[in-house]
Amino acid sequence: MSEKFQAVVIGGGPGGYVCAIRLAQLGLKTACIESRGSLGGTCLNVGCIPSKSLLNLSEEFHKVQNLSSKGIEVGEVKLNLEKMMKSKDKAVTILTKGVEFLLKKNKVTYFKGLGSLKSKNEILIKDDQNKEIIIEAEKTVIATGSVPVSLPGIEIDEKIIVSSTGALKLDKVPKKMVVVGGGYIGLEMGSVWSRLGAEVQVVEFLDHITPGMDKEISSEFMKILKKQGIKFNMQNKVETIKKSNSGAVVSTVDKDGNKNNFDCDVVLISVGRKPNTEGLNLESAGVELDEKKRIKTDKTFKTNVHNVFAIGDVIDGPMLAHKAEDEGIAVAENIAGQSGHVNYDTIPGVVYTSPEVASIGKTEEQLKQANVNYKTGKFSFMANSRAKAIDDAEGFVKILADEKTDKVLGAHIIGPHAGELIAEIGIAMEFGASSEDIARTCHAHPTFSEAVKEAALSVDKRAIHS
């Protein structure tokens, strides 16, 4: 007899394991299936967490080389990349084991193996020894995430031509690295290896980096990265990538038809991700996909099959771990008969470079396109006492508010701890706050958060320190 569950989650990433825990909290007999062998998905294993570890460690390496100008004399600074990688891996191991403990604590049955639909109520699980079992599910949630995509005709070998996964595991610092794609992931990984000593060239098809970001922020971001030594080749299309004895040659053509060749040791392909739906056997249950191979769902995350749901990177929307987490909680509550929902207007996005970049809500470009009348408030970190005190004052805060109602419509930050500061704006937007609500909230001094308050004051031209 097959074991029966009230709910089964296929995928143990941020969306999947959070969904499974919430389902169990709500009293459902729940199982979670993960093929990787460790929980946490791309984010924890080969994405958010290991990349943040390397971003932090590379920043510390960079800072310590410049301490003498601050009155701290140090000896010769050496990089031990092997130890750095071990530190990164240790953080990942601790966190993945922590997630497994949470499933056990909440009495979620954890299956290690590849889950696929045998029918709308049956799930086939195949482990790494090809042993198969079948379980039954009253409700199934698909949360299998996404995988990196390459360019047509270019094979990623994770040695010379790498994805973000391979870029996290290099065994030596490349002398030259080409990053194909000027999005969040490419710029994060490019900045890591730049700080560790690589000469980094970014090749981008568009005329600006970080597509979808507020263009004023994007422009300032590129200026700062250029000052840090990263070189940009905009409006360049990659034609070929050919391996050579020493690495690879990336051949491009620019908007004027000029051809360029970039020699490098490593090429990082960072041109996006695609839903990970292969091998799920969705057709056996009749689950429909859209033209981009994403699973079609309604507002409750239900597919066209009444008892099959989907969340995270396999459905429409930004491919972000925290978006998947929110959807995981919402779909669990919907399955349990509650009214789970996600406010997609308040999902932040963060680039964890130095300085950090964070955005939430609408950009100026989006508001103009929608013919929304708005007002803007900006405040530079150059006038923020905490930022100046620690000599980390590049960037600014920008708040966008409705011209009539003063309701906060969006915010964009480039500067120290932007990823933390954006949360204040998220709370404000969730509760429909105005820029004046933020401006009249007392912020501790001296803190970076005062820049948010000053930007809010600036919306009505009342900033004190600018």
Model region roles, listed by residue range:
Residues V8-R36, T42, I49, S53-E60, ...:
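Flexible, glycine-rich terminal cap/loop adjacent to redox cofactors
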Residues I217, I311-Q366, H445-S466:
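A conserved FAD-binding loop/helix module that cradles the flavin
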Residues I21, S191, M222-K223, E365:
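Alpha-helical segments flanking ligand/cofactor-binding loops in enzyme cores
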Residues C48, I142-E199, V203, K231, ...:
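Glycine-rich dinucleotide-binding loop and its adjacent helix/turn
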Residues V8-I10, G115, I135-G145, V180, ...:
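Short hydrophobic core segments
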Residues S2-G13, V173-G183:
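Beta1/beta-strand and adjacent pyrophosphate-binding region of the FAD-binding site
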Residues S2-F5, I21-V173, L206-T210, E216-I217, ...:
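Glycine-rich flavin
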Residues D157-V173, N260-I335:
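FAD-site-proximal beta/loop scaffold in flavoenzymes
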